Amino acid sequence: MNRRTRPRTASRVAAVQALFQGEQAQESLEAVIEQFVRFRLGALPGQDGFEDGRIPDAEVPLFSRIVRAATKEQDVIDPLLITALPAEWPLARLDPVLRALLRAGACELRMKDGPPPRVVINEYLDIAHGFFQGEEPRMVNGILNALARQLRPEEFAGERQQG
């Protein structure tokens, strides 16, 4: 995120971080959401950046919706990811941040009232570039693109799939 923070992007970054924290600390879903809402979302008075790990301008409803849905639907999301991942990359082998990012992206792709698939893919690709310098962003793009075509084929009707 450059100088101008995009609130929906900030919400997605926070959701990835919250999913990571919940998995690593084995904290309850609601405890993690409450911690983020109280201590991590929104800028401190007189500051407008990401000081002290805060995420300014995040939309709390979108953040909460992604975290709740990704956690509650993990038993549906994980098999989708396992199928989309290369065989040599089991879900458990992935970096925990990458796993959280893919779960959040897959969760949004499953939301029928969510943004168009290309928006979801681009948002999480941008987030992946913020966390990773290697091949992970390409992996995110490929996996989320495959899931988008599987979950919302009507939005890709008439396109040839590149291979």
From Swiss-Prot:
Keywords: RNA-binding, Transcription, Transcription antitermination, Transcription regulation. One of its GO terms (molecular function) is RNA binding. One of its GO terms (biological process) is transcription antitermination. One of its GO terms (cellular component) is cytosol. The keyword RNA-binding applies. It holds the Pfam family NusB. Transmembrane segments: none annotated. Belongs to the NusB family. Involved in transcription antitermination. Required for transcription of ribosomal RNA (rRNA) genes. Binds specifically to the boxA antiterminator sequence of the ribosomal RNA (rrn) operons. HAMAP family: NusB. This is Transcription antitermination protein NusB. The lineage of its organism: Bacteria, Pseudomonadati, Pseudomonadota, Alphaproteobacteria, Acetobacterales. The gene is nusB.
